[in-house]
């Protein structure tokens, strides 16, 4: 089977332009998911390491990545990607006024590396039907005060 990303075409409205017709956009449609066990099996077929050993390493990798992010370290997974914690929140007038309680969100920034960039560069696409149709929300009439 040729490798391709499946997509469907879906209507989207611009919420700031009420009353205008929707425009149509591509939306990726997943074919399924790949678990750690699935990845271990795939990796086993490309090398001499047994599936259970690969799985054990992948599970340990989860723990090591989480611990490194908790320590404020940047996680570089070779040419695959880089992971780093970022923060956002409210500002203070002065540095002295700043308190940790002003931090409102913690996120993991994902930056794809060369391997993923190259994978995206060579994508093929196959159009499919919409998998999960989102029901159009009915607009409620404005209530007068």
Q: What residue ranges belong to the model's regions?
A:
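Strongly charged
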Residues: 1-56, 63-145
């Amino acid at each position: 089977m040729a490798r391709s990303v499946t997509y469907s075409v879906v209507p989207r409205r611009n919420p700031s332009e009420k009353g205008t017709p929707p425009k149509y956009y591509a939306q990726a449609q997943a074919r399924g998911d790949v678990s750690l066990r699935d990845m271990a099996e795939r990796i086993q077929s490309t090398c001499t390491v047994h599936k259970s050993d690969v799985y054990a390493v992948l599970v340990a990798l989860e723990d090591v990545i989480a611990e490194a992010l908790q320590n404020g370290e940047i996680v570089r997974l070779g040419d695959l990607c880089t992971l780093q914690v970022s923060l956002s929140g409210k500002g203070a007038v002065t540095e002295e006024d700043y308190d940790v309680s002003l931090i409102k969100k913690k996120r993991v920034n994902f930056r794809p590396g060369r391997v993923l960039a190259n994978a995206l560069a060579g994508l093929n696409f196959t159009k499919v039907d919409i998998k999960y149709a989102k029901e159009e929300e009915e607009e409620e009439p404005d209530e007068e005060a």
